[in-house]
Amino acid sequence: TSRGLGDVYKRQAPVFSKLFPDIPRDHPVTGSIFMNLSANLLGLDNAATPMGLKAMQQLQELNPNKESASNSMVMFLCINASGLTLIPITIMMYRAQLGAANPSDVFLPIMLATFTSTLVAILAVCVRQKINILQRNLILFFGGLGLFIGGLVWLFNSMEQEQVSLYSTLFANTLLFTIICGFIISGMRKKINVYDAFIEGAKEGFQTAITIIPYLVAILVGIGVFRASGAMDFIIQGVRFGIASIGLNTDFVEALPTMLMKPLSGSGARGMMLDAMNTYGADSFVGRLSSIVQGSCDTTFYVVALYYGSVGIRNTRYTVQCALLADLAGAIAAIAMAYLFF
């Protein structure tokens, strides 16, 4: 599969070279970055992490200041933290388990929301790093994606709700099946033992996990204090009062726990999402919105602690600011998509 993804990467190399100008041409880290982002696109979080950690180690080798994040690290982390996901397999699985009539009805809203958060993350980092976003390759790539997403919004917005559910499900299932078959066929053509390759990667991932445990303990303790202090409940009630006071719809406020927890803890946000679906129903507005939020961005502080901690980076520069801006954009887009589709 790595060689197959490498073939796809070669087609996107002009875009990568613009976003990561400090990485030498044909350096192995480009393949690791692309494989990590590809795994995230497929919703394979556990598979993406070892690839991402390997990419960080390779980026650290290129980094002249071993304690401060390089420009390439910041760009990579912000894209990662934006949670770019094409097929939210886990979320659809939870929705099915909790009795959703159509577990994949959130597929398209999630894709639109996560595209928004990723685009904001890239633009924010480009501005900070003074990367010219008007370069031809970037305009063609992101302009094409924007037109594709905009076209989908227009198409599905003109359909009845039953048609939206039918065609979004068909699109997701067809795409997933095609990708899986593509990996298998690519492996057979190149005589790669995919299972053995997976086992070797798992061994490396286990060794890395031992290295990062202290950093994870620190971030999880901080999350626990925030939850136990009641600060989250205070924020939610304040937002509800503010929204109601200006006469706006407050239905989305019940999904705020998932939005607030998402940048801090993936398991915490997942628990908030499941709690919302159990309380209000998997097919309720709140249940669907919580699912969209869960898929629209990633756990920023967890990703930063995990990835930077694995290579000993202490100065993260503006990574957190840009990633949180992307999280905010993803949350706003998730709310907009929920009102649009449901």
Located regions from the model:
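Hydrophobic alpha-helical transmembrane segments of multi-pass integral membrane proteins
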Residues: 16-52, 217-235, 240-276
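Membrane-interfacial loop-to-helix junctions in multi-pass transporters
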Residues: 18-31, 62-70, 168-175, 206-214, ...
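C-terminal transmembrane helix pair
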Residues: 48, 55-96, 100-130, 256-342
